[in-house]
Every structure is written in structure tokens, then in C-alpha cells.
């Protein structure tokens, strides 16, 4: 007659199962989250593209988005964000829209410090390295009804955190970017201004990353994570 398992054998087996689960479960959870974040980014990309088109076709409010920097187009930043039905804003859009065109945010204080992009060191690239944003753009941030957050960043980039202040706050997972080229309606990921510049977060020099049509896939898989933005939309 065969003997059953001893208590020690059962405990050892359960211990092994626990170790394996502890090693694999986080990866499974992350993969599931990443699929959700990817779908959320695609949704936000579509909503943002539609909002820009609506601003262009909204009665007499047809913007001339030819400046190289969102800071010089705060009026249109507010108009675009209004189409997204933002809940909170880091700039006082009610005042800015009354003034018309775009007040110079470098000279006049129209900021609302209750809403900002992530603080320095509280968001990360895909390698786990803390990130920083040029402080001049921290307030160019809007919280949306679905708890996502957008930031009109350096030059003509727009950063999107699909779940707002919730973790992981990591580029290529829940943080992405798009670009609106000068004088154009369609979002893309390459043409950031009127002269060649292929870097994301380029106003924060040591944190700027070159993303091109030839390196974005490798960056998504092995680099900082900004390359995941075009990879998820274009591939």
C-alpha cells in the first residue's frame, strides 16, 4: 500500500508553488495592465485628434496654430481642452479665453497651482529612471473626466497619462506622447517644429530622448519607453 505525502512534503510543495507564483504573478499583472493602458492611450489619442479638428471647425474660432511652442498658444490649448471637457486645469482658461488669441504665459501669471504634471522624480522611464519636466510647462496640464491627464509640453508635444496620478506613472506603460506639427491638423510623432528636432521632452535637456521613425520600436522594447507611443498607434 502506497503511503500518502507527509506533512513536510506538502509544505515543501506549497512553498515551491508560492515562490513560483510570487515570481510570475507580478509579470502577469503588469502584462494585463499594459494591455489596458494601451487601449486607453488609443482612446485618448482618438479623442485628442477629434478635439483638435473640432476647434478648427467651431464657428469663427478657427485657430492659426503656427507658433512653435504651446506656451505661445495658450488660448488654443484651452479651446482644445474644453472640447475634452476637462475637470481641472493648471492654467486659468476662463481668463485666458476672454482675452482672446494667446496671452504670453512667460510674462503674465495665469497659472493655477492646484493642477500640475507629475513632480520631478515621481514619474519614470521604462528603465525605472526618475524623470523631470521643464518647470515652465508643469501647469499646462488638464485633468479629464476619465481621470486621465494631458500636458501641453515643450514645443508642440502633448504628454498623456492615461490614468492620471495613479501608478505606475511610467513612460511606455501609462505615459505617452503625441505631436501636432505646425499648421497641420493631424497628430503624429515626428515633426515637432519648423526645423528638425526628433527629441521628446526636449526642453529638459538631460531628459530629452531622440525618437525617430527608425528607432521607436527598439526604444519601446529596450529603451526609455517613449517609442511605445508611435508603436501602439502606427503598428
Where in the sequence are the language-model features?
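N-terminal single-pass transmembrane signal-anchor helix
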Residues: 2-33
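Alpha-helix exit/C-cap motif
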Residues: 49-68
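Intrinsically disordered, low-complexity regions enriched in Pro/Ser/Thr/Gly and acidic residues
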Residues: 69-235
Amino acid at each position: 500500500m502506497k503511503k500518502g505525502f507527509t506533512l513536510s512534503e506538502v509544505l515543501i510543495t506549497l512553498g515551491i508553488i508560492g515562490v513560483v507564483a510570487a515570481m510570475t504573478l507580478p509579470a502577469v499583472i503588469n502584462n494585463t495592465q499594459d494591455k489596458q493602458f494601451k487601449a486607453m492611450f488609443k482612446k485618448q489619442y482618438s479623442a485628442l485628434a477629434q478635439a483638435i479638428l473640432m476647434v478648427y471647425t467651431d464657428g469663427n474660432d478657427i485657430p492659426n496654430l503656427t507658433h512653435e511652442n504651446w506656451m505661445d498658444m495658450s488660448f488654443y490649448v484651452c479651446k482644445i481642452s474644453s472640447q475634452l471637457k476637462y475637470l481641472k486645469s493648471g492654467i486659468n482658461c476662463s481668463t485666458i479665453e476672454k482675452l482672446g488669441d494667446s496671452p504670453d504665459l512667460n510674462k503674465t501669471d495665469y497659472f493655477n497651482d492646484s493642477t500640475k504634471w507629475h513632480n520631478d522624480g515621481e514619474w519614470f522611464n521604462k528603465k525605472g529612471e526618475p524623470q523631470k519636466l521643464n518647470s515652465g510647462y508643469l501647469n499646462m496640464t488638464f485633468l479629464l473626466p476619465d481621470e486621465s491627464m494631458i500636458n501641453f509640453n515643450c514645443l508642440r508635444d502633448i504628454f498623456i497619462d492615461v490614468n492620471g496620478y495613479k501608478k505606475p506613472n511610467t513612460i511606455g506603460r501609462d505615459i505617452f506622447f503625441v505631436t501636432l506639427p505646425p499648421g497641420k491638423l493631424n497628430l503624429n510623432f515626428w515633426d515637432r517644429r519648423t526645423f528638425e528636432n526628433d527629441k521628446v521632452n526636449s526642453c529638459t535637456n538631460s531628459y530629452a530622448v531622440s525618437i525617430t521613425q527608425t528607432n521607436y520600436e527598439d526604444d519601446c522594447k529596450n529603451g526609455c519607453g517613449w517609442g511605445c507611443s508611435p508603436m501602439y498607434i502606427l503598428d
